[in-house]
Amino acid sequence: CFHLFNDYSGSPKVLKIVLEGLLKKGYQINLITSTGGALDELLYYKNLSKHSYPYRFSNNPIVTMLRYYMVQLYTFILTFRWLFYKDVTFYINTLLPVGPALAGRIMGKRVVYHYHENAFVKGTFYKVLATIMQKLAHKIICVSEYQASFLQQKKCVITVPNALPQNFVNRLTPNFQAAFKRKHILMLGSLKLYKSPLEFI
């Protein structure tokens, strides 16, 4: 499983839920991601091995892109340690880990993308990555039908909406009548301006 930047944003948190479900079912998982972040909370599972690299954003976009390309080269090369393993699936979380996706395809492995972004509202770089994803992926998991509607590839695309962590759901005690009277709404969203509405009416 490949994820570029292990922080506490939405995509690594969703990946954590997915991986935890697989780990509890006994799957052996190799996680390749940066140091720190939400995914490190899975390290106590004995059937998970983590391979880390240093990665962070810079205020200088050129430095950020150089770091990104270095990580793609590193993970592309690292990926070949699974060349002779059978029944290996390369799970690519977000558009960004294109290096291991390409290596997986070269080796004849099954490549599954979990596509969190909407590349077609983010600019040329993400549009190029989305085009590459559609060429390399055996399966693309989208988080909404709206997001999937922008993809040219339709055959291998499925929609799986993001879930909330089970420990959060367990704390809920729904009372629909009381909720209707209170008229309070919980809106879960990103703090990033381009992802969130400015007003909720």
Regions found by a protein language model. Give the residues of each.
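A short, glycine/small-residue-rich beta-strand->loop->alpha-helix junction that serves as a flexible
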Residues: F2-I17, L193-K195
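A short, histidine- and acid-enriched strand-loop-helix "catalytic/donor-clamping" loop
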Residues: F5-Y8, N59, V98, M107-F125
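Carbohydrate-associated surface elements
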Residues: Y146, A163
